[in-house]
Amino acid sequence: MTTPTTPTTPTAPTTTITDRMPLPRISLLGSTALLFEAPGAMDLPQQRRIWALARLAQNWPQVQEAVPGMNNLMLTFSSPPPPDLAPLRAALHEAWDEGHTMSLDGRTFELPVAYGGAAGPHLADVVAHTGLSVDDIVAIHTAPLYTVYALGSHPGYCYLGGMDARIATPRRKVPVVHLPGGSVSIGGIQTGVSASDGPSGWNTIGRTAMQFFDPQSQPPALLAPGDRIRFTVLRVDV
């Protein structure tokens, strides 16, 4: 005779520290600024959370300016924040955990780009890294409608989201000391457009004639987070 056995009750899976989403990182920048770095993917849903957090934090009494970056937010203060940052950290964590997002109804710009040649001196390096042809890279680069995630690096420079990972190329080991304004470049999984002359460690594949920053205009930067860019082909030089 077989003795019946008592069914075992399934146990709930145990959540360990490694199963949890990493916490945002909060650090001081000098004596009057703080940087909030969000974990997770660098994509539009994530960036919309950054925009929402910036809008909220901008209204906090101690915050002078809230500046969204790529997966991060910088808060500046008119005077050094109190030594005990626990309340501010808690407010940031709580606001982030609420998961609010913000959609920005920006404008759409078409940027004619001269690819390759003197305008895109590193296009050959992108070809060598990806194994794609020049025509393939240009076609892939011009296909998306890119969203301006943030402004930074230098006045008017726009960080764009939405580049196809097939043309991702590591940043250059030796930066270029002088890169003309309007240069269209690839750095890792990102692409962007230089607003003015200056150094860069990205791979320049082309150039546009559009002016992105004019200190005499109001606002001086042409683009803003939430705007969209579509690159078009002016010509391809090889």
Language-model features and meaning:
Residues T2-P4, T15-V238:
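Glycine-rich active-site loops that engage anionic ligands at enzyme catalytic sites
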Residues P7-P13:
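Low-complexity, simple-sequence tandem-repeat tracts enriched in small residues
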